[in-house]
Each structure stands twice: as structure tokens, then as C-alpha cells.
């Protein structure tokens, strides 16, 4: 609970829900007859409607990117360090929109929603969704809000992929595209990590083929293991060494397999336990599959430069030196393709010890660079 909401916070915010009755045909060939998207806004839309910024979330993200839902909240939104008055995404200048994507588990239509055809939760029957599907649904939300063009579309990790897809799918609707700690497609290693996480969930006896809600259970063990695998990839070796080293939780070895002996074990189990209590297993499967499928250059014979030729936006690409999940080399692939396509691009490689999670952490150099780019965007 904050003793007082900070002056540079957007303050108390309330989610809003947009309902869509127009069917949305997905890349998998299936159609959502109707659906809803939950979102939050921060700042004010100007008279020209030229100052809107879209925030795209990563795998476990959601619509609550900044501020507090109540004065009793212990923590603000997941990107509060970057969104607010005077911050990198300055809400005194910008009207910021953040939503929970289709297939999510925080209020937008997803596997835990009721399937109108059966009256039961969708569960495993919810269709596989892609980054392109998300961008098309986000475009409909923009239409609903009266936003013809985004001043910027911004995202980190999977969110950065959505920002890139926006610049490709709706080039006339994006003035600036910011892709942070992202990649033009997943490497084989990243797909492998996702598959291990999925198998942890699928092999949990409580998964019940994805219809665990009807059984009144959750695949807690599988979700815990999936999250533990994920967290290993989000942190750098240096960050884990500095934070935990080989420190013991109780100053002694127990010579068994059931005790939590090392501090890093305790950390991973805590993260897995916390995550399994708030996230939906089917959503986790969907998000990782959307990551695996993202490959915009596939439609152009794997020519990323040709893929970006349609873009009209200016680009800012940021990476972090110790990120081995989406390494700086992957960001430079994006930059090289943009340059080959003769696009305006700013590239920032930021020295940060935290690994992939660095895009969520208020590193002064990162925030300064982020703010510097956003400040040059005319509204």
C-alpha cells in the first residue's frame, strides 16, 4: 500500500471495456463472432487526436500498465516507471492506451471467458491467436476511440513484435514505432524454451485437456514449472550471480531433494507459485504460440527489408547488453533491415546487467534514452 501516490504517477485509474459485435476472422481460419477488449487510458486525447500512444504488452502482461486501481494497491501498473507525468511516455503530452490482448486472462475475451456456443468456458477450444490478430483487434479499438493514427506504438519483448507488426499491417496509422528488447522472429532456442514450458503445462494431470475450469482445478504444478523456466531466461547470468550467487536459504545443506536449499531455488519457486495463482494456463499456451508464429518476413521469402518497405513510421529500436533471450544481435537484424529499406531508425544498445527483464526496470540510462526519443515526437 503506497503511503501516498507519487506526484509523477497517473494516479487512480479504472479499466474500461469495449465490446465488438463485428466478427473477427483470425489467421488460423476461425472466427470470433463477438469479443471484448479491456483497456486503460492515461492522459488526455488532444483536439487534433494526434497525441495517442499504444502500449503493447509482453507474454504475461495486461492492460494495467500504470497508476493504481485503489489506494490499497501495493504496486502500480507493470510499466509505471515509464508512463506518467514527466516520464518517458509523458502523460502531460500523450494520451496513452494500454489493453489486454485477445486470449488474455485479465478481462479481454480469452480461454476463461464463456463460449456462447456452449455456455461453458472456452478452455482449450479458444482459437490460436497471432500477433497479426492482436494488431487487427487493436486497430478496431483505435477506431472505437476515434484514433486514426498513433503518434507511437510502443512495446517490449512480445510487445515490440506487435509494434513492428503495426508498422507493417497499418503503415499509414503509425508515426513512430518503438521495439524494445525484441526480435524479428524467434530463434530455435527460444521456440525450444517455449515448448518446454508448454509441455510442463500439458503434462500436468490437472490440465484435463485444457478444460480444467470445468473440473474446478488448475494445473498449478505445470504453470509453476513453465514460469520457472521463463524466469531463468529473463535474467542474465551476472544478475543471478549478483542477486543470489550460491547463497543458501538456511545456511546449511540438507542432503535431500525436497528442501529449498539455495536462494535461487527459493526465488524460482516463489515466482512460480505467485504466477500460478493469477495466470491462466491456456493463455500461457496461446501467448507462447503467438511468439513462435511471429515471422513477418515469411510472406516475403524471408526478406525482412522488403517486408519493411511498406512502413511509413520512424523507428526506435532498443536492446540491452546482457539480454540473451532477445540479444542485441536480434535487434540489429531489425535495424539492418530497416536501413536496407531506407527507413529512419534510431538504435540504442543500453548497458544493463538485468538481462531481458531490463526493459521493465528503471535503469537511468534506459529511461533517459527512452524519454529523449519520445520527447522528439511532435503532437
From Swiss-Prot:
Q: In which pathway does it act?
A: Amino-acid biosynthesis; L-methionine biosynthesis via de novo pathway; O-succinyl-L-homoserine from L-homoserine: step 1/1
Report any one BP term from Gene Ontology.
methionine biosynthetic process
Q: Please state every residue range assigned to the domain named AB hydrolase-1.
A: 51-360
GO cellular component, alphabetical, reads:
cytoplasm
Purpose of the protein? Transfers a succinyl group from succinyl-CoA to L-homoserine, forming succinyl-L-homoserine.
User: Assembly and interactions?
Assistant: Homodimer.
Q: What name is this protein filed under? A: Homoserine O-succinyltransferase
Species per Swiss-Prot/TrEMBL record: Stutzerimonas stutzeri (strain A1501) (Pseudomonas stutzeri)
Upper lineage: Bacteria, Pseudomonadati, Pseudomonadota, Gammaproteobacteria, Pseudomonadales
Supply the gene name.
metXS
Amino acid at each position: 500500500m503506497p503511503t501516498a501516490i507519487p506526484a509523477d504517477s497517473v494516479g487512480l485509474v479504472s479499466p474500461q471495456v469495449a465490446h465488438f459485435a463485428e466478427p473477427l476472422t483470425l489467421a488460423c481460419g476461425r472466427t470470433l463472432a463477438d469479443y471484448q477488449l479491456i483497456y486503460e487510458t492515461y492522459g488526455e486525447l488532444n483536439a487534433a487526436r494526434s497525441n495517442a500512444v499504444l502500449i503493447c504488452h509482453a507474454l504475461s502482461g495486461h492492460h494495467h500498465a500504470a497508476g493504481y486501481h485503489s489506494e490499497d494497491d501495493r504496486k502500480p501498473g507493470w510499466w509505471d516507471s515509464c508512463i506518467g507525468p514527466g516520464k518517458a511516455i509523458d502523460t502531460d503530452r500523450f494520451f496513452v492506451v494500454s489493453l489486454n490482448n485477445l486470449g488474455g486472462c485479465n478481462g479481454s475475451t480469452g480461454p476463461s471467458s464463456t463460449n456462447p456456443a456452449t455456455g461453458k468456458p472456452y478452455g482449450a477450444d479458444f482459437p490460436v491467436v497471432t500477433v497479426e490478430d492482436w494488431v487487427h483487434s487493436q486497430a478496431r479499438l483505435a477506431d472505437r476511440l476515434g484514433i486514426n493514427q498513433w503518434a507511437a506504438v510502443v512495446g517490449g519483448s512480445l510487445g515490440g513484435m506487435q509494434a513492428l507488426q503495426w508498422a507493417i499491417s497499418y503503415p499509414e496509422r503509425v508515426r513512430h514505432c518503438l521495439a524494445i528488447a525484441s526480435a524479428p522472429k524467434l530463434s530455435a532456442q527460444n521456440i525450444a524454451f517455449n515448448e518446454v514450458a508448454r509441455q510442463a503445462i500439458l503434462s500436468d494431470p490437472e490440465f484435463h485437456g485444457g478444460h480444467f475450469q470445468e473440473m474446478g482445478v488448475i494445473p498449478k504444478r505445470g504453470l509453476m514449472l513453465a514460469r520457472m523456466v521463463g524466469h531463468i531466461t529473463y535474467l542474465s547470468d551476472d544478475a543471478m550471480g549478483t542477486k543470489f550467487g550460491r547463497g543458501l536459504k538456511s545456511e546449511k545443506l540438507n542432503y535431500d531433494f525436497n528442501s529449498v536449499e539455495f536462494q535461487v531455488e527459493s526465488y524460482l519457486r516463489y515466482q512460480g507459485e505467485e504466477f500460478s495463482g493469477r495466470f491462466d494456463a491456456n493463455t500461457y499456451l496461446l501467448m507462447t504460440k503467438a511468439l513462435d508464429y511471429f515471422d513477418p518476413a515469411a510472406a516475403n521469402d524471408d526478406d525482412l527489408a522488403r517486408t519493411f518497405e511498406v512502413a511509413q513510421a520512424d523507428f526506435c529500436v532498443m536492446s540491452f547488453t546482457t539480454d540473451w533471450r532477445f540479444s542485441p544481435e536480434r535487434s540489429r537484424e531489425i535495424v539492418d533491415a530497416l536501413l536496407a529499406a531506407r527507413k529512419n531508425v534510431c538504435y540504442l544498445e543500453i548497458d544493463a546487467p538485468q538481462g531481458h527483464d531490463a526493459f521493465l526496470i528503471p535503469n537511468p540510462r534506459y529511461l533517459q534514452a527512452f524519454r529523449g526519443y519520445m520527447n522528439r515526437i511532435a503532437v
